[in-house]
UniProtKB/Swiss-Prot annotation:
Cofactor: Mg(2+)
Subunit structure of this chain's protein: Homodimer.
Source superkingdom: Bacteria
Binding site for Mg(2+): D15, A17, D189
Species: Pseudomonas aeruginosa (strain LESB58)
Active site (record annotation): D15 (nucleophile), K56 (schiff-base intermediate with substrate)
Family: Belongs to the HAD-like hydrolase superfamily. PhnX family.
Record's keyword terms, sorted: Hydrolase, Magnesium, Metal-binding, Schiff base
Protein name, entry field: Phosphonoacetaldehyde hydrolase
Function in brief: Involved in phosphonate degradation.
CDD domains: HAD_PHN
Length: 275
């Protein structure tokens, strides 16, 4: 039996917060700040956004490893934060996250239309998130009331290693019955999510304006003067350089055009691993 390269995409694997729901990715960010505050440790929104895309325990561990935050923790507790301390913060983070998730559950403008167009092109819709399953259960239910249902969902604690490891993306490949990772496109607003797709051998699309990197509401984004938006886009594109996305677009609304371009490249024999 011979290997035949895929001729078209078979699936889009979409992130959740900052990609399909929660423009600006506010739900997780604010809760990190609140969870640390309950332990008397100040963390800014900007600091909290840094590791976004990772599983939430890993995110907290990464924050605790930042020297400035570690020193604030030491000032309160007289020691650097251990893994047990990270777990204590995580266990406070979780109920706060579940309680507040509905406040940031709106579907991103243009997402439903874009996803419908992808389905019309024959793509299945997989999804994964840095949220654990207990949070994703609520996120998925809220999204369904707003008209979005993915064909498959993988939470960060349903695989051995979350992002930037490729396990969640590959779990979607298996569940959706996709026969070649090169027939998948991973879409995300964070560098760990893009690395996840790259490591899984997929096409990757980074979102520059709807998620964590820009960190604005939809209304704030639309109100940005053109020159300021261009500066922000340049900054964000530089931030993504290390993860090497194949495409950078502002929001998921532009995704159908990217899919058509990828299909044309596949038809020419191009593969994601070679670009």
């Amino acid at each position: 039996m011979n290997y035949n390269q895929p001729a078209t995409l078979q699936a889009a694997i979409l992130d959740w917060a900052g990609t399909v729901v929660d423009f600006g990715s506010f739900a997780p960010t604010q809760i990190f700040v609140e969870a640390f505050a309950e332990f008397g440790v100040q963390v800014s929104l900007e600091e909290a956004r840094g590791p976004m895309g990772m599983g939430k325990w890993d995110h907290i561990r990464t924050l605790c490893d930042i020297p400035a935050i570690a020193e604030r923790y030491r000032a309160v507790f007289g020691r650097l934060p251990s893994d047990d301390d990270v777990t204590a913060i995580y266990e406070r983070f979780m109920p706060l996250q579940i309680e507040k998730i509905a406040e940031h559950s709106a579907v991103i403008p243009g997402a439903l239309q874009a996803i419908a167009e992808l389905r019309g092109m024959g793509l299945k819709i997989g999804s994964c998130s840095g949220y654990p399953a207990v949070v994703m259960e609520k996120v998925v239910a809220l999204a369904e009331t707003n008209g979005y249902v993915a064909d498959h969902v993988v939470a960060t604690d349903e695989v051995p290693n979350g992002r930037p490891w490729p396990a969640q993306a590959l779990a979607n490949v298996i569940a959706l019955g996709i026969d070649d990772v090169a027939a998948c496109v991973k879409v995300d607003d964070t560098w760990p999510g893009i690395l996840e797709g790259r490591r899984a051998g997929m096409w990757t699309v980074a979102l520059t304006c709807s998620g964590n990197a820009l960190g604005l509401t939809y209304e704030q984004y639309k109100a940005l003067p053109a020159a300021e938006l261009e500066r922000e886009r340049t900054r964000i594109e530089q931030m993504f350089e290390g993860s090497r996305p194949h495409y950078l677009i502002e929001t998921i609304a532009e995704l159908p055009a990217v899919v058509r371009d990828i299909n044309a490249r596949l038809a020419r024999g191009e593969m994601p691993q070679g670009n």
